[in-house]
Amino acid sequence: MSLRPCLTPSSMQYSDIYIHTTPHPHTPHHTHHTHTTPTPTPHPHTHTPTPERSLSLRLRQAKPDQPVSQITLHYPTSPLVTLTHSTIPPQPPSISLCTTTNRPSTITVTLQLPISNSTTTYPTISHLLLTILLFYPPLLKR
């Protein structure tokens, strides 16, 4: 079973990006504004304390006259996941990934930007901002 891209093979472009990130230290959100409430109201959705890692990358396309059709992103120390995006995102897409216990060395994120017919033209994508949020389960030892 293979996915048929909407772009013709001659106009397909692939971009492989290898990213190495370091986890940011957790900064508290509410630093300036101390509210003292008599009775604290618990939230219905309790957040499990999972460390977050987010990365942002800008992609330059190979040819300036054609939009990038597919992007493969390799993220180290993360589970292997392939995601597709069917349309050109009007804003940077946010992708949430859940990790597993055994972690492969790379994660592959595939962004597919199809052109449905030859008359459809997209503005040139000079930069595509992709934000990936990685949620890690609590590590036993590190």
From Swiss-Prot:
Bias type Basic residues, positions: 26-35
Region annotation Disordered: where it falls in the sequence: 19-54
Name this protein carries in UniProt: Putative uncharacterized protein YDR544C
Annotated organism of origin: Saccharomyces cerevisiae (strain ATCC 204508 / S288c) (Baker's yeast)
Lineage of producing organism: Eukaryota, Fungi, Dikarya, Ascomycota, Saccharomycotina
